[in-house]
């Protein structure tokens, strides 16, 4: 009831608003009102003999508000008249048609008509009409790429409804719209990616034909778990992972949005838990209050008049561990009913949000969906995963019945959770806490219960499992219990991090010496100042060395340290106190106190073998590295080619005439040019000049160096060859002229002396002048 109705009621004399909390205590399930859900389907290969019920809602039409529609996991939907009772000795199952070929997650009645829409896991939503005693399908709406999770009609328009699915899309449908070219229903408005981010369903990146456009890579789509219309132009939605409730203005065309659509208002998650997903949304009759079931075991109430991000109330006490738990309001809007994962359903008085008013116990597993009828007896329906649904009615008081009679006649009873005298109207209602015995009737988590027990004086005392260090000493700690009280552990003086091993006995004694208090009765203030200055002159190292360790592991150490002589009486007193260790309760012992102290002894066996130090890396640039590599390569062993190059360099240093003579006598490449020259001057037979030059060009490629050498020595080689060839030519002429032409056996021609040219080119004929 809103504030306006309250003011009008006060004007008419009805100032005191009365409730019926006492009547809810008498809710019970008679044996005739316990049903076994819908009969299972036989078509599915995964046969489930007890399919759970996912949705149950009463009709929203006058004269038929006692009709209940329920849908199960097999895709079956059936109608039940809640005024009829089951008079059979056993629980009976209802018979319903096969409406979908997958689970039906939600259904919603049209306002003022006997029509309802169903949302299924087969990616479709279907419109049904009640005809006689059965249902008839009117149309199928295909637009989602994943399971359709929720559906909602406009508050006063039975022709427009909205659907939300696991693909993150919210589709607005108008049953009066024309069909598409493929005779499918046309979407009136689309809100794609309404709830993105969080642990939602990842989007597939493979290419496929879908009606829902894909989002950018790396983003996730949060499933649409709840839809509710505030009015005909305002739609409210919630997601499974983003933790935000969004308010959409349907007068905008969200279909034309290419980027993420922007809602008109946002209501972020108001808690501090990581379970921030919402499972269900309901709006009261006035349209000013929004109730949202959250995964953090809380139902949040928001003010829709101002869209404040801070909730008005937080209804606690349930256990919400799945996305199938739903809630509803009473017909008068004064009470809130919700399912729970602890096998119960809970009813809250909206004026007291701290804890539930009544708990309905009768199911054996999680209670998922609930419904509150508006007929004359206001029945309550609870559905569970045990494939049972129970109808709760207000009956007689059961306190006078025995346990056997109650178990025989009833299948569910209600019990108070909140105490009226202390909780509802008491001044200290906010300080009420639970004890361990209340765990059976209160769905509190164990952690929350233990936190409450810490702050409750009369509750079970919490015992710590931690032991102090003195308790772990065992016998040594027990000896001191009789003489003195256990003291708290002293705060360490050093400000650095904690040490892995405790301090040695010497260091403990030194610390105890520093913490020794000075008795004011022993000396005057001036004398105490002198003694303090003298005590400061004694270094802590000398104090430590004055009390050597008596560990058996350090007996082989021959070093004996003695403290330097002091003339001060205060220093001697300090040294005497160091020899007397403090009592066990005041000192802190360590398991390593008797081990050798290599720092004080000055020697350690592991320090003799030290790994060599690494040479520091020299910082040299890349140019210097290249220069060093060239120098190192020059110092390597000399190869045969390098020796030949050194000999050529030695020849260059000789005189030009000596170089020409060496080249003319030894180089075979230089004699190739006179062959070409002789062949040009020779008019007789022999190898043609063209073929000789061609073969030479193939065997000896012409380079700038070789051409330069040939040009420099051409003249010198020409005269040297002419000189060597002129003398043998004269001898051959005189020899050939001696025999006659008639001699049948002419003497053999004696070959001239072999020259380098004739030896290298035996096929070349030397012409005579």
Curated annotation (Swiss-Prot):
Residue spans of biased composition, Basic and acidic residues class: 524-533
Protein purpose: Substrate-specific adapter of a DCX (DDB1-CUL4-X-box) E3 ubiquitin-protein ligase complex required for cell cycle control. The DCX(DTL) complex, also named CRL4(CDT2) complex, mediates the polyubiquitination and subsequent degradation of E2f during S phase. E2f degradation is necessary to ensure proper development. Substrates require their interaction with PCNA for their polyubiquitination: substrates interact with PCNA via their PIP-box, leading to recruit the DCX(DTL) complex.
Any one Gene Ontology cellular component term annotated for this protein: cytoplasm
Biological process terms in GO annotation: mitotic G2 DNA damage checkpoint signaling; proteasome-mediated ubiquitin-dependent protein catabolic process; protein ubiquitination
WD repeats: 99-129, 143-174, 194-249, 264-303, 320-349, 362-393
Principal location class: cytoplasm
Superkingdom as given in the UniProt entry: Eukaryota
Compartments where found: Cytoplasm
Tissue-specific expression: Ubiquitously expressed during embryogenesis with no sign of tissue specificity in expression up to stage 17.
Upregulating conditions: By heat shock.
Gene3D superfamilies assigned: YVTN repeat-like/Quinoprotein amine dehydrogenase
S-S bonds: none
Molecular-function GO terms, alphabetical: protein-macromolecule adaptor activity
Modified residues (Phosphothreonine): 201, 456
Biased composition (Low complexity): 689-704, 728-743
Residues bearing the modification Phosphoserine: 204, 459, 524, 655, 679, 691, 711
Organism: Drosophila melanogaster
Coiled-coil residue windows: none
Family: Belongs to the WD repeat cdt2 family.
Residue stretches of biased makeup (Polar residues): 503-518, 546-562, 657-666, 705-714, 758-769
Region (Disordered): 196-221, 448-467, 476-562, 655-769
Keywords: Cell cycle, Cytoplasm, Phosphoprotein, Repeat, Stress response, Ubl conjugation pathway, WD repeat
Protein name listed in UniProt: Protein lethal(2)denticleless
């Amino acid at each position: 009831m809103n504030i306006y109705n309250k003011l009008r009621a006060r004007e008419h004399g009805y100032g005191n608003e009365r409730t019926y909390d006492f009547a809810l205590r008498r809710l019970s399930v008679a044996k005739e009102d316990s049903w076994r859900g819908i009969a299972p389907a036989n078509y599915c290969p995964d046969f489930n003999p007890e399919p759970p019920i996912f949705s149950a809602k009463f009709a929203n039409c006058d004269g038929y508000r006692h009709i209940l529609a329920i849908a199960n996991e097999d895709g079956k939907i059936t109608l039940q008249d809640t005024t009829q009772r089951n008079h059979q000795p056993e629980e009976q199952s209802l018979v319903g048609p096969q409406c979908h070929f997958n689970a039906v997650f939600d259904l919603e009645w049209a306002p003022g008509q006997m029509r309802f829409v169903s949302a299924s896991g087969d990616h479709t939503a279907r419109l049904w009409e009640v005809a006689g005693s059965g249902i008839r399908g009117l149309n199928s709406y295909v637009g989602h790429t994943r399971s359709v999770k929720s559906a909602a009609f406009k508050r006063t328009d039975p022709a427009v409804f909205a659907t939300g699915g696991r693909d993150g899309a919210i589709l607005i449908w108008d049953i009066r719209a024309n069909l598409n070219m493929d005779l499918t229903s046309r979407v009136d408005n689309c809100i794609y990616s309404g709830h993105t981010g969080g642990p939602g369903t990842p989007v597939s990146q493979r290419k496929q034909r879908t009606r829902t456009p894909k989002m950018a890579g790396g983003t996730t789509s949060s499933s649409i778990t709840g839809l509710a219309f505030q009015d005909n132009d305002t739609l409210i939605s919630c997601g499974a992972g983003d933790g935000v409730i969004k308010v959409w203005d349907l007068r905008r065309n969200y279909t034309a949005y290419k980027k993420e659509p922007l809602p008109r208002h946002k209501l972020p998650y108001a808690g501090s838990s990581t379970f921030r997903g919402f499972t269900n949304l309901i709006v009261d009759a006035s349209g000013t209050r929004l109730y949202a079931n959250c995964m953090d075991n809380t139902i949040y109430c928001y003010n829709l008049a101002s869209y404040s991000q801070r909730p008005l109330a937080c209804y606690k006490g349930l256990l919400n561990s799945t996305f199938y738990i739903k809630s509803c309001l009473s017909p008068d809007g004064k009470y809130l009913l919700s399912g729970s994962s602890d096998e119960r359903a809970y009813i809250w008085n909206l004026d007291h949000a701290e804890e539930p008013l009544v708990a309905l116990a009768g199911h054996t597993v999680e209670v998922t969906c609930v419904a509150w009828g508006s007929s004359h007896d206001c029945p309550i329906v609870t559905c569970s995963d045990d494939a049972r649904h129970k109808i709760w009615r207000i009956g007689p008081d059961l306190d006078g019945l025995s346990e056997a009679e109650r178990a025989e006649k009833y299948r569910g009873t209600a019990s108070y959770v909140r105490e009226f005298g202390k909780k509802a109207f008491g001044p200290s209602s906010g300080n009420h806490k639970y004890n361990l015995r209340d765990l059976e009737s209160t769905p509190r988590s164990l952690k929350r219960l233990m936190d409450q027990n810490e702050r409750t004086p009369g509750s079970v005392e919490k015992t710590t499992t931690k032991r102090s260090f003195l308790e772990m000493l065992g016998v040594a700690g027990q000896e001191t219990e009789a003489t003195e009280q256990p003291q708290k552990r002293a705060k360490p003086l050093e400000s650095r991090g904690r040490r892995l091993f405790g301090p040695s006995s010497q260091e403990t004694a030194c610390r105890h010496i520093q913490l020794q208090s000075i008795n004011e009765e022993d000396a005057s203030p001036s004398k105490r100042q002198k003694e303090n200055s003298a005590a400061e002159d004694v270094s802590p190292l000398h104090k430590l060395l004055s009390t050597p360790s008596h560990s058996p592991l350090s007996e082989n150490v021959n070093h004996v340290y003695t403290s330097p002589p002091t003339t001060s009486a205060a220093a001697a007193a300090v040294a005497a106190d160091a020899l007397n260790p403090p009592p066990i309760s005041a000192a802190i012992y360590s398991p390593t106190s008797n081990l050798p102290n290599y720092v004080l002894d000055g020697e350690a066996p592991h320090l003799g073998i030290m790994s060599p130090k690494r040479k520091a890396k020299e910082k040299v640039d890349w140019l210097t590295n290249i220069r060093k590599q060239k120098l190192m390569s020059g110092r390597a062993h000399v190869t045969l080619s390098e020796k030949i190059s050194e000999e050529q360099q030695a020849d260059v240093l000789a005189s030009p005439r000596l170089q020409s003579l060496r080249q003319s006598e030894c180089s075979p490449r230089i004699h190739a040019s006179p062959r070409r020259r002789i062949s040009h001057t020779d008019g007789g037979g022999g190898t043609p000049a063209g073929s000789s030059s061609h073969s030479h060009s193939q065997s000896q490629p012409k380079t700038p160096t070789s051409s330069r050498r040939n040009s420099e020595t051409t003249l010198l080689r020409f005269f040297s060859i002419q000189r060597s060839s002129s003398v043998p030519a004269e001898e051959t002429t005189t020899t050939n002229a001696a025999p006659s032409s008639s001699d049948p056996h002419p003497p053999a021609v004696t070959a001239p002396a072999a020259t380098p040219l004739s030896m290298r080119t035996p096929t070349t004929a030397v012409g005579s002048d």
